[in-house]
Regions:
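Metallo-beta-lactamase
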Residues: 1-40, 44-48
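N-terminal beta1-alpha1-beta2 submodule of the flavodoxin-like/Rossmannoid cofactor-binding fold
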Residues: 46-122
Length: 122
């Protein structure tokens, strides 16, 4: 699953993410049956690691961050905001805080949205 986790997260967060309550209801129903495979309309068919996959859906559907850290998304026309964002990231890292940065002018929005689900602070 590890190889496909980033894409699974990106799909969930961008397509299914706003339906957390409905996903929770479905996960409750799914817990009462034996699942041999998951066949989504888009993406991979899951035959192995189904428990891990369902755990991720549980986490994502309750909007629980996967990691503690800060995601910094910025746009910078003249470079000043990029410099400020980098300075913020450096200061946070000096304090032991994990950080990830995204330049919104070059990073696909779907990746930024997925990261917003993954990290505890924006």
């Amino acid at each position: 699953m590890r190889d496909y986790l980033d894409e699974a997260r990106r799909y969930y967060c961008n397509i299914v993410g706003k339906y957390g309550t409905q996903v929770q209801a479905l996960l409750k129903k799914a817990a009462t049956v034996e699942i041999e495979r998951i066949c989504p309309l888009h993406g991979f068919v899951w035959r192995r690691g189904i428990g891990d996959f369902l755990e991720k859906y549980q986490k994502w559907s309750t909007y629980t961050p996967e990691e503690t850290g800060v995601m910094i998304a910025y746009a910078s026309v003249y470079g000043n905001t990029a410099n400020a964002a980098e300075l913020l990231a450096v200061r946070l890292r000096e304090r032991g805080v994990k950080t990830v940065m995204f330049d919104v002018s070059v990073t696909p929005a779907s990746e930024i949205i997925a990261a917003a689900f993954r990290w505890s602070h924006l």
